[in-house]
Each structure stands twice: as C-alpha cells, then as structure tokens.
C-alpha cells in the first residue's frame, strides 16, 4: 500500500478495462484503500486504484458490529487498516414442505434434516469478534462506501493461520499487481507502430524484437544469421527510425543515427531479447553466429521428449514425473551444456501444447 497510489489523473478508456485482469477479479485490497479509492467518471460503480478498474473486492477481517434486518445482516468488518460495512443477504428459507409426509420414516428423515440445518446455522452464526471473509461489489449508500456481498462466511481460524497468510500475501500482491500502473500492451504497441519516432532506444529495441519474432514465426524460419534479419525491409525500416535521447530531466533531444554500426547494434540487442525469452538460441557457444529458432528445432523437441519419457519409467519419477531442474540437468549432459532454462521452458510448453507431455503439478512433467 503506497500513499497516494490510488490517485490516477487520467482514466484508461472503459473499453480497455477488460484487458486488465484486476477488473474481472475479486481484488484483495486493504479496507483503507477501498474507502479511499475514487469512483470512475466514466462508469458509476467502478473504482480506480492506481489506474486499475475495480468493481469487486475480497476482504478478511474481524466483525466489530452486527445489525439484523428482515432481508440482510449488516456487519462492520475491521482489517486493522479501516472499517467497512458489509451487506450480507440472508439465505432463503427452503424448509417448508408442501405436503405432509406419507410415512413415519419420511417424517423422521425430515426432522433429522431440520435438526441438521439448525445445527449448521448455529455453528455458522456470525457474532462480534468472529473472523469473516466477504466477497462482493462496492457500493455507495448515503455517501458511505460499503460492500454488497455475493459470498460471505465465518472463518474458523483459532491459531490465526488464515489471517497471517493474508497479511503475508497482500504486500506481495500490491507490489506486483496493484501498485504497478495499468498499461495496455496492445494500445502501446499500436501507438508505437503509428509513431515509432517517438520511442526511446530501449522501447525501439523491444519493438524491433517483437517484430522480428513475428517475422520468424510467420515464415517458419529454422535458423538465421543476424545479417539476414538486417536485410528484411520492414525490420530495417523500423531500426532506422529516429530515437529519443534524454539529455536531462527536462530536456529531450531527437537524434538519428543510421550508421551501419548503430543498426547492427540495435539488431543484436533485439535478438538478445529473443534469446532471454528462450525463443532463439545458439549452438557451440555461437562461434558460427548462427541462431536457431526454438519452435522449429524438431530435433531438440524429440530429445527433450525422450529424456522425460525414459526417466519417467524410473521408480523415483513414476508417480510425480520429472522436475524441471532434473530435465534441465539431463539435457545439459546429453544434448548441450549451454542449454538455457528459458529455451527448455519454451520446449516444454510446446510439447505440452501438442499433448506429448503433461504437467502433473507445478514444474513436474511426465510423458506417456
């Protein structure tokens, strides 16, 4: 949670909100931030945290107040950062029986079910001091923000395991998701293509890398030299675009350097980005400067598949399969010492897409 991080001067157009996964999720936020978020000017009922559109939240806290109405309960929930009112609708009564039981056995069964339901209601009754989890949409009623629950339940947490887990989870989610401004990669890419001259050098390199990837995939290129990419007209035209060089914090200079050395350098950096993602790789430590496209190297696919297939027959791998690091170690021994984790991950994903292997659990794979 960062001070002022919920403020965003410019709203993302509502048509692009669906590109942000936070919009469709139940956002796990501190209650303080739920109370401080500003409502969208475009769509009432949607709130913004650091540019992220939020309409549903997930809170966990202690009940500090209970009010009962005919149709709902109103719980005051405190998570130690703030207190918010949660409207939790009562469950419909489905106990009524339309016709009298025709036998004593049916009467006995009905009585037992009624007693069971009463026991469940008693055990799950929420009182002051209980821990409650609420998931629902944010509403404003009489200028007070509240949550209208779609799901709520009492949390049985005598040794605070669940609450401690939430306390450890939230800072990580904030750091990795909520405190990162919402950016639409599709929109940024479209803007970059329409005006590539407005990019700085790292952004232009990243865009060139993406366009090179598309070229390699569309043409099913198996291997290439850097010089061959430099001869592709569309890629060369993009690399020739002027870039922005920031001379100081308040001064921006436009500079165009189209020397062959500069062109060679930007292509080299673009290919390096592809290598870091495991999309291309080199054999024999790159002595021949030849790059291989991971997706098209069927021989590498077969060898990795064979390693998994053979090792999964061994007793210690039959149940869970082979771990990623085990496959990597075997591949480096039998295929190539310099095989990177990124390349192996790409191969495993391709094999899994083709149903040659399956992931039994996180980082474990097996073959049939």
Curated annotation (Swiss-Prot):
Residues 1-185 are annotated as: Interaction with CTC1. It comes from the Eukaryota. Residues 191-295 are annotated as: Winged helix-turn-helix (wHTH) 1. Residues 296-368 are annotated as: Winged helix-turn-helix (wHTH) 2. Keywords: Chromosome, Disease variant, DNA-binding, Nucleus, Telomere. GO terms for biological process: negative regulation of telomere maintenance via telomerase; positive regulation of DNA replication; telomere capping; telomere maintenance; telomere maintenance via telomere lengthening. Its main location: nucleus. Residues 57-155 bind DNA. SUPFAM superfamilies: Nucleic acid-binding proteins (SSF50249), Winged helix' DNA-binding domain (SSF46785). Pfam families: STN1_2, tRNA_anti-codon. It is found in: Nucleus; Chromosome, Telomere. One of its GO terms (cellular component) is nucleoplasm. Transmembrane segments: none annotated. Changing residue 164 to A: Defective of TEN1 binding. Component of the CST complex, composed of TEN1/C17orf106, CTC1/C17orf68 and STN1; in the complex interacts directly with TEN1 and CTC1. Interacts with ACD/TPP1, POT1 and POLA1. Cells expressing STN1 mutants defective for dimerization with TEN1 display elongated telomeres and telomere defects associated with telomere uncapping. Component of the CST complex proposed to act as a specialized replication factor promoting DNA replication under conditions of replication stress or natural replication barriers such as the telomere duplex. The CST complex binds single-stranded DNA with high affinity in a sequence-independent manner, while isolated subunits bind DNA with low affinity by themselves. Initially the CST complex has been proposed to protect telomeres from DNA degradation. However, the CST complex has been shown to be involved in several aspects of telomere replication. Component of the CST complex, a complex that binds to single-stranded DNA and is required to protect telomeres from DNA degradation. The CST complex binds single-stranded DNA with high affinity in a sequence-independent manner, while isolated subunits bind DNA with low affinity by themselves. In addition to telomere protection, the CST complex has probably a more general role in DNA metabolism at non-telomeric sites. This is CST complex subunit STN1. It comes from Homo sapiens. The lineage of its organism: Eukaryota, Metazoa, Chordata, Craniata, Vertebrata.
């Amino acid at each position: 949670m960062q001070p002022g991080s919920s403020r965003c001067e410019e709203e993302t157009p509502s048509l692009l909100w669906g590109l942000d996964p936070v919009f469709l999720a139940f956002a796990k936020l501190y209650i303080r931030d739920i109370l401080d978020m500003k409502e969208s000017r475009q769509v009432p009922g949607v709130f913004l945290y650091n540019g992220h559109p939020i309409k549903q939240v997930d809170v966990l806290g202690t009940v500090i107040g209970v009010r009962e109405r005919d149709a709902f309960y109103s719980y005051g929930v405190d998570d130690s950062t703030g207190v918010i009112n949660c409207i939790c609708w009562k469950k419909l009564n489905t106990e009524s029986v339309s016709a009298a039981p025709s036998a004593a056995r049916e009467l006995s069964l009905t009585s037992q079910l009624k007693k069971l339901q009463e026991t469940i209601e008693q055990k799950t009754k929420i009182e002051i001091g209980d821990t409650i989890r609420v998931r629902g949409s944010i509403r404003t009623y009489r200028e007070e923000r509240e949550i209208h629950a779609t799901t709520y339940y009492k949390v049985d947490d005598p040794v605070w395991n669940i609450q401690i887990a939430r306390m450890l989870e939230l800072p990580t989610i904030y750091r990795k998701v909520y405190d990162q401004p919402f950016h639409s990669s599709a929109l940024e890419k479209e803007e970059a293509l329409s005006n590539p001259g407005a990019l700085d050098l790292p952004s232009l390199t990243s865009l060139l890398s993406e366009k090179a990837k598309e070229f390699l995939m569309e043409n099913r290129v198996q291997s290439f030299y850097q010089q061959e990419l430099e001869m592709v007209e569309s890629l060369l035209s993009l690399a020739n675009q002027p870039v922005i060089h920031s001379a100081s914090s308040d001064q921006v200079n436009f500079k165009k350097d189209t020397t062959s050395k500069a062109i060679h350098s930007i292509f080299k950096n673009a290919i390096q980005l592809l290598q870091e993602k495991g999309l291309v790789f080199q054999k024999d430590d790159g002595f021949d400067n030849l790059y291989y496209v991971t997706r098209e190297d069927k021989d590498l696919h077969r060898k990795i598949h064979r390693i998994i297939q053979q090792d999964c027959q061994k007793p210690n791998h039959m149940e869970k399969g082979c771990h990623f690091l085990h496959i990597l170690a075997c591949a480096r021994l039998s295929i190539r010492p310099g095989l990177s984790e990124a390349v192996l991950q790409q191969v495993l994903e391709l094999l899994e897409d083709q149903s040659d292997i399956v992931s039994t659990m996180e980082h474990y794979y097996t073959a049939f």
